[in-house]
Amino acid sequence: MTRRYWNINLEEMMEAGVHFGHGTRKWNPRMAPYISAKRKGIHITNLTRTARFLSEACDLVFDAASSGKHFLIVGTKNKAADSVASAAIRARCHYVNKKWLGGMSTNWSTTETRLQKFRDLRAEQKMGRLNRLPKRDAAMLKRQLSRLQTYLGGIKYMTGLPDIVIIVDQQEEYTALRECVTLGIPTICLIDTNCDPDLADISIPANDDAIASIRLILNKLVSAICEGRSGYIRNR
């Protein structure tokens, strides 16, 4: 893996609240090596370790992007959804930011069928064919299209399983993480002090509840993806 400098600044992470964990009663003992202190009933994450694992994750995604690999970013809770979408769009990654439909990756054939239906309905709408149908039929198909856009809009260009999955909030996206583990898809996961650091391939200890923290971590990762991808495009 190529080791590069990613300008990961401890002061910047502190300003974003990356170091704030959960209450000391809500913690996973396996997170002990990643916790540096307790303050007012809250665990404080060791930002030196955060920087180390974030740098490793940036190296991984840079190398993957340099060889044309595809990424999926998953984060469906309200505080993460907008940051996930904007980061993914910036780096031209696929994303899921509303709801992970069970079996989305492990039952890929069903997902492919849904995606094809989504593409067909989008094409019908663009050509104005839905408006030529009886009102009841048109309304039903438009509702179906709206639902597909909500849940599959971020993966509408996916033609196969991703090469690497980036997950915001291990507990919230546990189903997605387990599916990736089952399929052997490498994962990078933001983990708060209530998570299990051993589940993902690279776990980044960080506050997964603060928007600023989520945005900072994602921005570092997608910057590495963009840099790697630009090199891939130049060398093609």
UniProtKB/Swiss-Prot annotation:
Gene Ontology molecular functions: structural constituent of ribosome
One Pfam family linked to the record: Ribosomal_S2
Subcellular location: Plastid, Chloroplast
Cross-referenced InterPro entries: Ribosomal_uS2 (IPR001865), Ribosomal_uS2_bac/mit/plastid (IPR005706), Ribosomal_uS2_CS (IPR018130), Ribosomal_uS2_flav_dom_sf (IPR023591)
Chloroplast among keywords: yes
GO cellular component terms, semicolon-separated: chloroplast; mitochondrial small ribosomal subunit
Annotated GO biological process: translation
Signal peptide: none
Regions crossing the membrane: none
UniProt cross-references to PANTHER family, sorted A to Z: 30S RIBOSOMAL PROTEIN S2 PROKARYOTIC AND ORGANELLAR, SMALL RIBOSOMAL SUBUNIT PROTEIN US2M
Family (UniProt): Belongs to the universal ribosomal protein uS2 family.
Name of the molecule in the record: Small ribosomal subunit protein uS2c
Gene designation: rps2
